[in-house]
């Protein structure tokens, strides 16, 4: 809706102002998350881990305010790091994608997509892995279930037209 778009533009405008105000002496624009900053918290990727709970568990969060929208990077208590680009987790750059399968006709239902991916994959999916719907609308990525569940997110399936 128009109101949602207007609110998002306001959030990005505030994030841009934050970007300028957060420059340190060497021009760094990556800052630890500040739970007392509502403007920054509004830029949190949809369905990403709750910031306070994440920090309470011993994880860390950094926000690159030079990006529009700002990129949030979560590091868990085991040292695993995932960057959220345009609101989506980038499992591939983090080295967590074991294999990818492209569904040329795009996504259908989760069960049908998983079945198609199992048939198209070069090797069988590991028993401790899951297929992640990438935001491009046609790629499934094999990722360890533990990592996929820990780094909560809005996946590519959420963009599928219903």
For each predicted feature, which ranges?
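Nuclease and nuclease-like effector domains acting on nucleic acids or nucleotide cofactors
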Residues: 5-130, 135-162
């Amino acid at each position: 809706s128009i109101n949602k778009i207007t609110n998002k533009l306001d959030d990005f405008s505030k994030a841009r102002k934050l970007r300028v105000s957060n420059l340190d002496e060497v021009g760094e624009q990556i800052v630890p998350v500040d739970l007392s900053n509502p403007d920054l918290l509004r830029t949190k990727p949809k369905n990403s881990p709750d910031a306070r709970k994440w920090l309470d568990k011993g994880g860390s969060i950094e926000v690159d305010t030079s990006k529009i929208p700002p990129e949030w990077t979560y590091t868990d208590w085991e040292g695993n790091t995932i960057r959220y680009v345009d609101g989506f987790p980038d499992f591939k750059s983090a080295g967590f994608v074991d294999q990818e399968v492209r569904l040329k006709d795009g996504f259908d239902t989760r069960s049908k997509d998983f079945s198609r991916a199992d048939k198209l994959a070069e090797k069988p999916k590991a028993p401790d892995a899951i297929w992640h719907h990438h935001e491009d609308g046609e790629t499934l990525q094999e990722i360890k279930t533990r990592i996929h569940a820990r780094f909560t997110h809005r996946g590519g399936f959420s963009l599928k037209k219903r």
